Amino acid sequence: MIGTRMARLALEYFHIEDADTYRDLIAFVECDRCLADAVVSVAHCHLGKRRLKWYDYGIMSASFYDIASGKAIRISQRQDVPRCPKGEDVVAFFNQFSDAELFHVHEVELPDFMEYDLPGKPRKTQICETCGERVHDGRGVEKNGHVYCKRCAGEHVYYVEGAELTAEQIAAGV
């Protein structure tokens, strides 16, 4: 419910009447909880459309950037908002609070936001000189005049790669 209210508040602030057809809103969510799903559902900002950015801060907040106006706001949950008691109707519980009682809203600037972060087709594609994989949207790492993906450049990645699977192994499954 918190994410739904945040997204609705952002749409209201930017005077967006039809989120389904509006293409100039980008959302930045700061957690991987239900808030993120609500922002996708209400504001129609999708990861695959490059209109949703996720930052793993573990915080129930989201920022919204309107490309058309160049303005951005960050909406965060006030800490004095009580939790919905177990067994109560979540919608009814949170509807008793105004947006001002639920949220802090601040204008923000996005200093790390780049042209490459905008929705649309990749503006730049590079090939990693080590593994040969395509690196899109300015995410390549340049070292000594060479371009690498983050993994090959030695930056932390979330996995350790094992042996490549054959077509037979894939068909057989786990």
Model-inferred region functions:
Residues M1-A10:
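Conserved phosphate/anionic-ligand binding catalytic regions in large, soluble enzymes, centered on
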Residues R23-Y57, S61:
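A structural-propensity feature for long, helix-poor, extended segments
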Residues R50-R83:
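C-terminal edge-of-domain segments
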Residues F103-Y116, T130-V135:
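Short Cys/His-rich Zn2+-coordinating modules
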Residues F113-T125, G138-K143:
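Short, flexible, mixed-charge glycine/proline-rich loop motifs
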Residues C128-G132, C149-C152:
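Short cysteine-rich clusters marking metal-coordination/redox-active sites
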Residues D137-G138, Y158-Y159:
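Short, non-ligating residues that shape and space the ligands of small metal-coordination modules
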Residues E142-E155:
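Cysteine-rich micro-motifs
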